[in-house]
Curated annotation (Swiss-Prot):
Binding site for GTP 1: 9-16, 56-60, 118-121
Source domain of life: Bacteria
Keywords, alphabetical: GTP-binding, Nucleotide-binding, Repeat, Ribosome biogenesis
Coiled coil region boundaries: none
Lineage: Bacteria, Pseudomonadati, Pseudomonadota, Gammaproteobacteria, Pseudomonadales
Gene Ontology molecular function terms on file: GTP binding; ribosome binding
Cysteines paired by S-S bonds: none
Name the UniProt record assigns to this protein: GTPase Der
Gene this protein is translated from: der
KW Chaperone (keyword) present: no
C-alpha cells in the first residue's frame, strides 16, 4: 500500500511551499477537484524509490471554540487518511497556542506524527528543537522548505518504515533477452496473487454493481475480508482457471446486493488502488457522457503508468442516437488514452462484463513484456528511416540505439545526440511506432532519451614539430604567391 503523508499546521507556516517542493519532481496530479477535495490538495511524489501520496491541508487557526470545532473538517479527514503526519510549525514565530492545541489532538489520535520546524534560516537549530519539545511529539526536524534545506532528512524519517516500490526498476536491473529469443513476460504478481485489478470511477457510476457482477456466478471466491487500511478490500478470485485480485475501494457490501448505493468518494483510496494495481478498469456513466471529473481520474491512472481498460456502464436503454453521440464524445475527449480498450456494458444485467477479462489479460501482457535491445533498436532504425528527426540548426538529431529500461509501463530508453531537442510530436511518432510494431494494447508507453558524450570534447590538436614546420612552410609559400599576384596587377 502506498503510504500517505499529510501536511498539517496553522496558516502561513509553509505547508503549500513544502507541498510544491515535494511534488516538483512529479507534477501534482490533483489540485482541488471541485466538489471532491475542497480544502485539501493531493499530490503524488517519489523519494529514493519510495512512492507516496501527499496531502496539503488548510491552515488551523485555533482561535475560537473547542479543539474539535477549531480543527477544520478537511484537516481532520486528512489526518485520519494519513499514515504519517508532518506537523509544520514556524521556527521564527515560535511555539503558539494553536501549535499546542494541534499537538494535543495528534497525540490523542495516536498517529505517527513528526514536528517539522520550518523557516529555520538564520535560527539556531538546537534552540528550535528546545522551543517545540513541550508538545511531546519528539525532537523537531529543522527544515527550510523554501530552499530545500533539511528535506532529505525529513523524508528519511517519515518514510523509513515503508519499503521501496515493488515495481521499482533501477537502471540495468531489467535482464537482457538473448539475441534471437522471443519477447518474454517479466514474472510479476500474476504468478502469485493473480492480476491486481482496481475498479475506479466517479461516485454512482456503477462500480459497486460491477464489483458484485464480477464476483458473481461462475466465480470462485477465495475470501472476502476488509483490508486493514482505509477500508480498501482485496478480493482474490478465479475465473476460467485464471487468478485475479480485485481491489475494491467502494467499501464493504453484501455479496448478493446488486443495486447501486451512494458511494463516498475517497481520493486517497483511489490513488492507492491505482498504484497497487496492475490493471485499472475505469468505469464511466454512459448516460452522463464524459465529464471533467472523469478526465481528472483518468489522469491519475495515466500518471501512474498503469494498464487501462475503460468500461462505459449503463449502456442499456440508450437510443441509437444517444449512443452515437457518446462515441463521438469519447473519441474527441479521450484522445490522450486512445491506447485503452473501451467496452460498452451493463453491470446491472451483466451485458458485456465478461469481455472485460480478455482486455485485462491483453493489457497486462503488454505492460510486462520485455524485448531484446536488437529488436527495439531495429524498430528505431526503421522509424528514423521512414521519418527522420528534424534538423536543429545545421545539424540533424541522431538517434543511435534503444533498449528496455523498465516495465509496467514499458520504458524504452533511446540513446543519441541532441536528444534534449527532440520535439514532442516526434516523441509521439516514436511511441505510436513502437505501439504498432510491438502490438501493445491497453498500456501507456514511455520513452526516455539519453545523450551521448563527445569523446573528443575538450581535446585540442597537438602538432608534432615536423607538422609545425610544414605548416610554416605552406603559409610562407601562400604569402609569396599572393604577393606575386598583387605585383602583376
Amino acid at each position: 500500500m502506498v503510504p500517505v503523508i499529510a501536511l498539517v499546521g496553522r496558516p502561513n507556516v509553509g505547508k503549500s511551499t513544502m507541498f510544491n517542493r515535494l511534488t516538483r519532481t512529479r507534477d501534482a496530479i490533483v489540485g482541488d477537484l471541485s466538489g471532491l477535495t475542497r480544502d485539501r490538495q493531493y499530490g503524488e511524489a517519489k523519494w529514493q524509490g519510495r512512492s507516496y501520496i501527499l496531502i496539503d491541508t488548510g491552515g488551523i487557526s485555533g482561535d475560537e471554540h473547542g479543539m474539535d470545532e477549531k480543527m477544520a473538517e478537511q484537516s481532520l479527514l486528512a489526518i485520519e487518511e494519513a499514515d504519517v503526519v508532518l506537523f509544520l510549525v514556524d521556527a521564527r514565530a515560535g511555539y503558539t497556542a494553536a501549535d499546542q492545541m494541534i499537538g494535543e489532538h495528534l497525540r490523542k489520535r495516536n498517529k505517527r506524527s513528526y514536528v517539522v520546524a520550518n523557516k529555520i534560516d538564520n535560527i539556531d537549530e538546537n534552540l528550535a528543537r528546545a522551543e517545540f519539545s513541550p508538545m511531546g511529539l519528539g525532537d523537531a526536524i529543522p527544515v527550510a522548505g523554501a530552499h530545500g534545506r533539511g528535506i532529505s532528512q525529513m523524508l528519511e524519517i517519515a518514510l523509513r518504515e515503508f519499503p521501496k516500490d515493488e515495481d521499482e526498476l533501477e537502471e540495468g536491473e531489467v535482464e537482457e533477452v538473448a539475441e534471437g529469443q522471443e519477447a518474454k513476460r517479466i514474472p510479476g504478481p500474476s504468478e502469485k496473487d493473480g492480476i491486481k485489478i482496481a475498479i475506479i470511477g466517479r461516485p454512482n457510476v456503477g462500480k459497486s454493481t460491477l464489483v458484485n457482477r464480477m464476483l458473481g456466478e461462475d466465480r470462485v471466491i477465495v475470501y472476502d475480508e476488509p483490508g486493514t487500511t482505509r477500508d480498501s478490500i482485496y478480493i482474490p478470485f478465479e475465473r476460467n482457471e485464471e487468478k485475479y485480485t480485485l481491489i475494491d475501494t467502494a467499501g464493504v457490501r453484501k455479496r448478493g446486493k446488486i443495486h447501486e448505493e451512494v458511494e463516498k468518494f475517497s481520493v486517497v483510496k483511489t490513488l492507492q488502488a491505482i498504484k497497487d494495481a496492475n490493471v485499472v478498469i475505469f468505469v464511466m456513466d454512459a448516460r452522463e457522457g464524459v465529464v471533467d471529473h472523469d478526465l481528472n481520474l483518468l489522469g491519475f491512472a495515466l500518471e501512474a503508468g498503469r494498464a487501462l481498460v475503460i468500461a462505459l456502464n449503463k449502456w442499456d436503454g440508450m437510443t441509437p442516437g444517444e449512443r452515437d453521440f457518446v462515441k463521438i464524445e469519447l473519441e474527441r475527449r479521450l484522445f490522450f488514452v486512445d491506447f485503452a480498450d473501451i467496452h460498452f456494458i451493463s453491470a446491472l444485467h451483466g451485458t458485456g462484463v465478461g469481455n472485460l477479462y480478455q482486455s485485462v489479460q491483453n493489457s497486462f501482457k503488454s505492460a510486462v513484456t520485455r524485448w531484446p535491445t536488437s529488436r527495439l533498436t531495429q524498430i528505431l532504425e526503421d522509424a528514423v528511416s521512414e521519418h527522420a528527426p528534424p534538423m536543429v540548426g545545421s545539424r540533424r538529431i541522431k538517434l543511435r540505439y534503444a533498449h528496455l529500461g523498465g516495465a509496467n509501463p514499458p520504458l524504452i530508453v533511446i540513446h543519441g545526440n541532441q536528444v534534449e531537442k527532440v520535439p514532442k510530436s516526434y516523441v509521439r511518432y516514436l511511441e505510436n511506432t513502437y505501439r504498432r510494431v510491438l502490438k501493445l494494447v491497453g498500456t501507456p508507453i514511455r520513452i526516455e532519451f539519453k545523450g551521448g558524450e563527445n569523446p573528443y570534447e575538450g581535446n585540442k590538436n597537438t602538432l608534432t614539430d615536423r607538422q609545425v614546420n610544414k605548416k610554416r612552410r605552406m603559409m610562407s609559400h601562400h604569402k609569396k604567391a599572393d604577393k606575386k599576384r598583387r605585383d602583376k596587377r
